[in-house]
Amino acid sequence: MKFMKLGSKPDTFESDGKFVKYAVSDLDSDVTIHVGEVTFHLHKFPLLSKSNRMQRLVFEASEEKTDEITILDMPGGYKAFEICAKFCYGMTVTLNAYNITAVRCAAEYLEMTEDADRGNLIYKIEVFLNSGIFRSWKDSIIVLQTTRSLLPWSEDLKLVGRCIDSVSAKILVNPETITWSYTFNRKLSGPDKIVEYHREKREENVIPKDWWVEDVCELEIDMFKRVISVVKSSGRMNNGVIAEALRYYVARWLPESMESLTSEASSNKDLVETVVFLLPKVNRAMSYSSCSFLLKLLKVSILVGADETVREDLVENVSLKLHEASVKDLLIHEVELVHRIVDQFMADEKRVSEDDRYKEFVLGNGILLSVGRLIDAYLALNSELTLSSFVELSELVPESARPIHDGLYKAIDTFMKEHPELTKSEKKRLCGLMDVRKLTNEASTHAAQNERLPLRVVVQVLYFEQLRANHSPVASVAASSHSPVEKTEENKGEEATKKVELSKKSRGSKSTRSGGGAQLMPSRSRRIFEKIWPGKGEISNKSSEVSSGSSQSPPAKSSSSSSRRRRHSIS
């Protein structure tokens, strides 16, 4: 740190308690100056020789026949005044980055200019600022920090602007030419925090592009904003480095606990809004902030009541990176925001596809598939969803994003488990989102035994499961959503469902009279399966017998026998 010593006389200021100071001299004090709570007993001559303002104040006091002067608005307070007073006495004072702003403002207040005395305090401070402070990286940062408490004096004297110019100019230099010291000791961890560089993998003298981040992130948010704005507007700094600085600033200053966030909502609101304002403009091809970081900002913006425009900007940015999100990151209290994010993503994805001369979403698009899996996992984990929000969010995902419906099935099953009060029509609405033909064998087996699913869905699951098991050519045709044969198989599934439902209604008292007959069946799915394919094994073994005897046996008798066999299978 640079410093400057002024004066040559020994310091003879002494204190009488906490609030009284005086200059030891052979002459008695002839003026008393009250600066805030502290009283100074001093001498007029050294003060008047350096300060135009003191000349006026002493003159006004003498007209009122008093030797006391009260100063209530001294910038820098009594400490800055004391340094100025000692300079007037010629005593040794030391100026450095920590006190020079206050002393410069106090000297301006006291009008310690060249017309009062040649080589006065203001002149000497300006020389030190230009030749020492503004040439030093860390001193410029420190001075900029001190200017905040001395506004508007520091702003009017252009100390703030000159500090910002000094800091930003050094940020923009070629890292290879840096000779000054800087702070680089990143040990913060977490998905939204800058990971410490592997120093052992770097060459000894290589300086990273983001060497300046830690020092600048010590600034208060308003000064930080002004520095980053100048750096951005220059167009000479990589946007990735700027985004990294913003992430580090959030990690440095934003509280982790919800209680701290809400208790200091005003300051945290300013922080979030400023960071969002400074985020580099992105597109999907060139995005500089992780989705996890953006979603964290979105969650905080909700908690602290950030402006709606801030949320809109975050929604837009998150939608560009949604394929990188985790389910944990996406668990936002306001489901409507998630809906907007997904809707924006799908709209952007469609535009991209159209720009690439695709008329529809392309099956196999990795980004689209990732988002499809993400939304299904979100639907399964968010227990606060209503039926309408569940359905609406699920319907935002196009078919091409769900080649397999296992994730959607899991989400539907979880929702039914969490909401046992669902009516039949509501369950039907939920299950209408799912295509049972797109379930894997494992999910299909689970669904066939799932007591929460409507009967119609279980029948469809069993039907298409049997098709796959038989390796029927129809099964491969059913996988295509545009095949006319598929419609036939759907109709068959529907007919099987109606068949089971009609049989269930007609069963009525017969099943009641059969007593423990139901215990003979291992499961609900087994009973339904045998309804659809009654006597499957027997029919296979006796097909020739049935074929040869069909012309000899009366139709009514054959029907009765089949009916009895079916009745026993399900009772």
From Swiss-Prot:
Q: Which PANTHER family match?
A: OS12G0117600 PROTEIN
Sorted alphabetically, which SUPFAM superfamilies does this protein's record hold? Answer: POZ domain
Modified positions (Phosphotyrosine) in chain numbering: Y409
Q: What is the lineage of its organism?
A: Eukaryota, Viridiplantae, Streptophyta, Embryophyta, Tracheophyta
GO BP field? apical protein localization; basipetal auxin transport; cellular response to auxin stimulus; cotyledon development; flower development; inflorescence development; positive gravitropism; positive regulation of flower development
Expression induction per the record is: Induced, in an ARF5/MP-dependent manner, in the shoot apical meristem (SAM) after auxin treatment of the shoot apex.
From which domain of life does this come?
Eukaryota
Please state the protein's primary subcellular location. other
Disulfide connectivity for this sequence is none
Q: What segments bear the compositional bias annotation Low complexity? A: 540-562
Q: In which pathway does it act?
A: Protein modification; protein ubiquitination
Q: Which organism is it from?
A: Arabidopsis thaliana (Mouse-ear cress)
All residue ranges annotated as the BTB domain in the record:
29-97
Q: Where is this region: Disordered?
A: 475-571
> Do the record's keywords include Secreted?
no
- Protein name, per record: Phototropic-responsive NPH3 family protein NPY1
PROSITE patterns attached to this UniProt entry: BTB (PS50097), NPH3 (PS51649)
Q: Which residues cross the membrane?
A: none
NPH3 domain residues are: 210-468
An example Gene Ontology cellular component term from the record? apical plasma membrane
Q: Which CDD domains match?
A: BTB_POZ_NPY3-like
The UniProt function text for this chain reads: May act as a substrate-specific adapter of an E3 ubiquitin-protein ligase complex (CUL3-RBX1-BTB) which mediates the ubiquitination and subsequent proteasomal degradation of target proteins. Coregulates with PID the auxin-mediated plant organogenesis. Regulates basipetal PIN proteins (e.g. PIN1) polarization to establish inward auxin transport from the L1 surface of incipient organ primordia; this process is essential for the progression of flower organs development. Recruited to the plasma membrane by PINs (e.g. PIN1 and PIN2) and, in concert with AGC kinases-mediated (e.g.
